Amino acid sequence: MRPNLLWVDKILDENNEAGVCIYDLAFKPDGSELLLAADNKVYLFDVNEGGQMQTLKGHKDLVYTVAWSHNGELFASGGADKLVILWNEKHEGTLRYSHTDVIQCMMFNPCNQILLTCALNEFGLWSTADKNVIKQRSVVRCCSCAWNTDGTIFAIGHGDGTITLRKGTNATEEPSIIIQRDNEPIWGIAFSSNRTFASRDSQGNPMGIDEIMAVIDWNKTLSFYSLDGTFIESKNLEFEPHCISYCLNGEYLLIGGSDKILKIYTRKGVLLGTVAQMDHWIWSVTVRPNSQTVAMGCVDGTIACYNLVFSTVHCVDHARYANRKSMTDVFVQNLEYRTSSNICCHDLVKKMSLYDTKLAVQLSDKIQIYKQTGGVSKNERRKQLKYTLQDTIRKDLSFSLMVVTHGHLVVCNDEKLECYDFKGIKKRSWNMKSIVRYLRVLGGPAHRETLVLGTTDGGVYKVFIDNDYPILLDSRKTAIKCIDINANRTVLASIEDTLVCKWSDIATGETLLQEPGCYSVVFNTVNENLFAFTTNNMLHVRTLAAPGHTTRGVGYVLGFVKNRTFCLVQYNLIPLEVPYTIHLYQYIERGDFKEALRIACLGVVKNDWKYLANKALDALEFDVARKAYKRVRDRKMLRMVWELKKMKSNGEPDAILRATILAYTKKFREAAKIFKENGFENRAMELFTDMRMFDDVQEVMTTASGETKKMLMRKRASWARDANQPKIAAEMLISSGDLDKAALLIIDNDWLELAIEISHKIDRSDLETMKKLSAYFIRKHEFGLASRIFQSINDMKSIVDMHVNAGHWTDAFAIADRHPKYVEDVYLPYARFLAERDRFEEAQKAFHRAGKEQEAMHVLEQLTSNSVNENRFADAGFYYWLLSQQYLDRSQTEENLTLLNKAKEAASLADAYYAYYPVFIFCSQPFSFERNENILNMARYLTFTPYIDNISKVFVYFTIAKIANEMGAYKSARTALDQLTNLRVLPQFELDGQIEVMTLNIRAKPFTDVESMQPMCYRCGLNNPLLGGMSCIHCETPFIISFVSFDILPLIEFKIENDISFDEAKELIESEPPLSDDDYNPLRGLKKGIKEIILNRESLSKLEQGHVIIQTFPPPLAPKFLFNVMPSITIAQCKGCNKVFDLDDFEMACLRKGHCPFCRTSYDRNEAFFVDEEEDEDNTNIPSFGQFSRFS
């Protein structure tokens, strides 16, 4: 810091004999005027000129204090006459008010027009908004006052050492904070809003302070407090201070007092130096707003104005830059990665040096060595910098230059250089012939670094840390100002006092280049050929061979790393991007592609990389071209370079390589010209055909052979196909003889006529193409054409598959008849076709014809299981009956007793599910199509069956209870309800309530069934209980029921004697009985106790044919003979399932459903195999098998 005296003056008394004390000073906010409180007047000075402008009179006694408002419209004065006078901007008194005692100090609010005035025993607040002065008595004398920076709080220092802090809105309120101190009076208070002030908490951790208050007293103490009254720290002064003021936005602190010296401190109270030495006590000090100008007043009337100049202390090493901050801090930046670190030294920083990871800082009485510990490695470079104190050299060395290396500190004092280690031990010294003007570290191994220095006699020397003898590199005429050496230590650049920069070869001493008017020069740290230098506001970046880039309006260049220069502009080091386009083009023009690549790697734009790549490719510099194309990620050109390198390794001449490059860059005619000039007409022809330039290829094709012309036709066909002209492409392929490719193209474009035409031309040995054509004809439904092709290649299997896939069953059956080996290929898909349409009997016969018995059984079993699980019990009964027939058929061929038992089991399940379906509908649906009597009979039938899957006994007994109760069978209803009490009723059926109601109601009914509801046995003629069983309880004769109404039919089973065959028995029954035995009944005359009725030949011959029903079953099941006891009741028999029915019920069921209600056999049953020739949408060429043909 260097103070410059601007002007000095002295205020004398009225007799101009002795000076008067200057009690207070105040700058106008715009800095143009300075107020002085001296004697009983207010003096105005012109700050710029230093002359007295005006003297204001209005006070009758000494004026102690003056203050300007924040906007410069008002200023105030007060003094021993107890008056406060307000003056306007024209220096006219506008208002005055008084206190009860001497006015000691005053200050305007920094944000509004509120004035704080302090007398000895009171203080008050005045504002332009409220003309009344709000006053508050003070027990202790008021000595000083100050507002904080935002005007919300004001502080008053008292004579007993206490400080009171109050809110700026009301003076009458009690102090919000009272700071108790020693008994010494507080003569100065100042606030600073600098947020970088740091204190420490109770645990020793640093904490930030928003705003601080500095306080001075005559106990020779400078103290700091926060706004909440917390003590921060204190500093001891060697004098009695009287005035204090912050300057430069709170960065520094000015204090004056009894030692007659105005001193400058840091914001933390660290002494930095002296501003001025006066002859008497310094009583007041103030700082000009927004400037570095300081005014001070002394007891003897002296007024002086100084301008503070802060010199720049800095150093640079490659991309790292360190500079002094706030006089006591070192701020280190890595300008390349934009990271930084602030080092607090708590002392005045005099000099510093930076090298690699080391930083040396000279303080007042010591030198501190720091080591970079954060942001060093490649992975941490983008993280925050961190420096740690490594060593301290506690010596007060005097020197002009200082540099640091890995393990040493080198200082220079005039002609002498001294080397110290980090412990302060002197290791080596060098004595030069003249004063050393410039010193820097070039680098080198640790503890063996190289220094370069310049002297005032023009000598440039190189010094090694471990060598006692300096080496002369160059001699200039005048003193050396700046030196640098390139990266490979071959070229030296030096600037002398005449500002002439010379570049010379270190080995030979030859001058390579000279430039006048240079202020600084630096070589690039990566590329030894690049350097930068500055002239008059110009930055030049060039090489020794050619001029380069020039930028206007920069300072001094201090560093040059990769594509960035670091220039010092005033006090800031600014990184500037260097465009290398000019240098790149210069190297390319000279044909030096390797150096051009090195320049490009420092940083050029994408277009420059492309230009370098293309030029290197033209020059057949494939390595450079590959690296350049890789930078722009041009994969196409990278592949081309790879192919060119491969061609070159295979011995291809340069002419072919250049022609290939021209072809890749779409210069086809130039490439073809090179091909023809070098005797490669074939390559020229391939080039033109690949690019579909057929007009140009004709010139090359004049002497071509037939095979070559065919190749041309193929190329044209390929081009036509790619150009979306497939028809032309097909014609070209036909002309060239590529019928297989032409056929594929015709098929892809769906040209049926061309496909028919080409099918006659294709060789029959080309099976693949013929099959593709036939597949195309099948898609177009041209089955005749496809069949003709298959026949021509003798592929009968494909014909069968074609008819099967198309559903042409008639044609498929005809082929299967002619060729038995294709029976399975025809009937197996046909069986699946029928099964998908629920034509299961026909599907089973088809499966049987195809020899797939297991698959037929699996399909039927799966359908049966699904029907039961889905509660489709009518279908379940039907499927179980079909399943029983299948088991029965298989038992005949395999003679397996297990299959016979399965057939019987399936038949019984069929009966049960058939009977359960109306019961299920009655319980689960609101309406039923069956009569209640029939449903009751079916439920009665189910009560005597064992437990079967999905047949609910709850539904069975609920049906009996409900219908029997309605029809007067109260006993049966009560029995059914009793059974329900032993069963669990599922809640989803919602039957619990109905069952409970019926149970209560049935108690009021008689425990009997009406006689009409009791089944009668047609053999003994006695009635049976409704729930008595499926056989008579008297004679044990089994009941035979009608499978529509489930009523008991008047049928009694009889058997024939063992020696009578079935055919004989049938013949006897069908014979005409004797006239005398028209009403013959075999039950008459039977003895009691006989259960089975066995008839001999005589009895059979007496039977009426219409009274006998014969049920025939496939072997090994025996036929059954049933006798109609009541011939007046006509009995119907289904020939499909052999079930017997009441004729009226059977006819009604068949009329309603169109088939037998049990086995679904239609009336027009036809067991013969036939084919329906009609083709319609629902039934196209589908053959029918037997009795189920109508129920698909």
Curated annotation (Swiss-Prot):
Whether Thylakoid counts among this entry's keywords is no
Q: What happens when the gene is disrupted?
A: Sterile. Defective chemotaxis with 86% of mutants exhibiting reduced tracking to the chemoattractant ammonium chloride.
Q: Does Repeat count among this protein's keywords? A: yes
The stretches annotated as WD repeats are: 17-57, 58-97, 99-136, 138-176, 236-275, 277-320, 475-513
For this UniProt entry, which segments traverse the membrane?
Answer: none
- Give the matching SUPFAM superfamilies: WD40 repeat-like (SSF50978)
Could you tell me where this protein is found in the cell? Cell projection, Cilium
**Keywords of the record:** Cell projection, Chemotaxis, Cilium, Repeat, Transport, WD repeat
Biological process per Gene Ontology, one example term: intraciliary retrograde transport
Q: Chief location of this protein?
A: other
Quote the SMART domains the UniProt record gives: WD40
Domain of life of the organism in this record? Answer: Eukaryota
Q: Which GO terms describe its cellular component?
A: ciliary basal body; cilium; intraciliary transport particle A; non-motile cilium
Per the entry, what this protein does is: Component of the IFT complex A (IFT-A), a complex required for retrograde ciliary transport and entry into cilia of G protein-coupled receptors (GPCRs). Plays a role in chemotaxis and sensory perception. Required for entry into and exit from the dauer larval stage and this may be mediated by daf-12, daf-16 and daf-41. Controls the behavioral response, namely the avoidance response, and pathogen-responsive gene expression in the response to pathogenic bacteria such as E.coli and P.aeruginosa.
Task: Indicate the quaternary assembly.
Answer: Component of the IFT complex A (IFT-A) composed of at least che-11, daf-10, dyf-2, ift-139, ift-43 and ifta-1.
The name on file for this protein is Intraflagellar transport protein 122 homolog
* Organism for this UniProt entry: Caenorhabditis elegans
Give the organism's phylogenetic lineage: Eukaryota, Metazoa, Ecdysozoa, Nematoda, Chromadorea
Task: Give the gene name.
Answer: daf-10
